[in-house]
Regions:
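Positively charged n-region of N-terminal signal peptides that target proteins for export
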Residues: 1-5
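Boundary at the C-terminal end of the N-terminal hydrophobic targeting segment
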Residues: 20-24
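Core nucleotidyl-transferase/polymerase catalytic module
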Residues: 179-188, 200-202, 206-208, 222-237, ...
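...with weaker cross-activation on analogous glycine-rich loops/strands in unrelated enzymes
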Residues: 209-313
Length: 369
């Protein structure tokens, strides 16, 4: 569909309710959206938003996750995704095994167990020739679906191994799953698993997916409907973090297409929120690498907001972000000596990647009331 200028609410409503895309958003519409977002921000969080907060905190505690302070540095190194248990005697519950916890997020995302096909997005990455005595100078990465590997292992005839056959099969299956947890990003699976616990309806309220961009796009579509008084179906709308105060249950999101990465995002205009909002509203796909954290605490007195996200430094991590004097997300995050940490950006000697809080925060997903 060709780009469309908003000319009247009725025409816009017809476009939005039909699920079409390709519309442009003018500055007046952004001002209207800002007012709606600010109005909702002044209302206390709903019971479901509180449940989202409680579940995120519970998962952080269960994972024994990491913590990042307001300077953007890790102050507590929690368990990592591929770790085994930390008990000396090796007798633990499944909740004490970090990689099993991370697998649980995938199972909740897909609403079924790994044995029932929950690992559709999980892959094992491998490099043919990497174990050769004289490996090639350049190794090419290949991927294998976890479900295919698990099916193969299940079909192996291990009867010749005697009483060890069951243990051998279990060890092979767990090794495959454990390596896939390290190979495939699970931050969006973590967020989706939190929403399952509420639960949010997957047909209307939340787009469960292994990619953050999917539910960010759904929130933008809801904001467009809100502009014309359309139906409020999605639990989240997209708001500008520069003009909207956070509440518990909201999500702060950033993108990782920055200068120095293979695919930087070329911002159009002074506002990152408006630039990406417009691009996505027009049906474009300007970003693919993004991350969202769940707001679990807002402390106006100390001008701090605490968020929790999955797969942050390979853990479930709690971060403390700065708010400005107006209670909005501050442009000043962490230690200015450090460049923002970005896995897609190579480290330079002059700018060590050591600040986990200084990111391209571009949207606040605001929870419904």
């Amino acid at each position: 569909m060709l780009p469309l200028r908003i000319v009247c609410p009725l025409a816009m409503l017809m476009i939005l309710t039909s699920g079409a895309s390709g519309q442009e958003v003018d500055d007046a519409s952004f001002r209207n959206l800002a007012k709606q977002c600010q109005m909702r921000a002044s209302v206390a969080a709903s019971s479901r938003a509180i449940k989202i907060k409680d579940e995120a905190i519970a998962q952080h505690q269960a994972f024994n996750g990491s913590r990042v302070d307001r300077t953007g540095r890790i102050v507590f190194f929690g368990h990592s995704e591929a770790e085994s248990d930390q008990e000396l005697d090796g007798n633990v519950s499944a909740r004490q095994i970090p990689w099993r916890q991370a697998l649980g997020y995938w199972e909740k995302l897909n609403d079924r167990k790994i044995g029932e096909g929950a690992g559709g997005a999980l892959q094992v990455w491998y490099y043919p020739g990497a174990l050769d005595d004289d490996p090639p100078s350049i190794l090419h990465r290949k991927k294998m679906q976890v479900q295919r590997l698990l099916k193969f292992i299940s079909g192996l005839d291990l009867s010749q191994m005697g009483p060890e056959s069951d243990d051998l099969r279990e060890a092979l299956q767990q090794s495959v799953i454990r390596s896939s947890i390290s190979d495939v990003a699970w931050s969006a699976a973590f967020v989706s698993s939190i929403m399952r616990a509420v639960p949010l309806d997957e047909k209307t309220e939340f787009s469960y997916d292994a990619s953050h961009v999917t539910y960010i796009t759904s929130a933008i579509e809801q904001s467009l409907r809100d502009l014309v008084g359309g139906e409020s179906t999605s639990f989240y709308r997209a708001c500008d973090p520069d003009t909207t105060k956070p509440r518990i249950g909201d999500l702060f999101c950033y993108h990782r297409h920055i200068e120095g990465t293979p695919h930087p995002y070329a911002q159009k205009g002074p506002s990152l929120f408006k630039s990406l909002f417009r691009d996505i509203a027009k049906g474009e796909e300007p970003i693919s690498h993004s991350h969202c954290d769940i707001v679990v605490r807002v402390d106006s007195d100390s001008s701090k907001v605490t968020v929790i996200g999955g797969n942050v430094q390979n853990s479930v991590t709690e971060k403390v972000l700065n708010l400005n004097e107006r209670g909005l997300l501050s442009a000043a995050q962490g230690n200015t000596v450090c460049d923002s940490y970005n896995t897609d950006k190579p480290t330079s000697p002059g700018e060590p990647n050591c600040n986990l809080n200084r990111q391209k925060w571009f949207v606040l997903l605001q929870a419904a009331i």
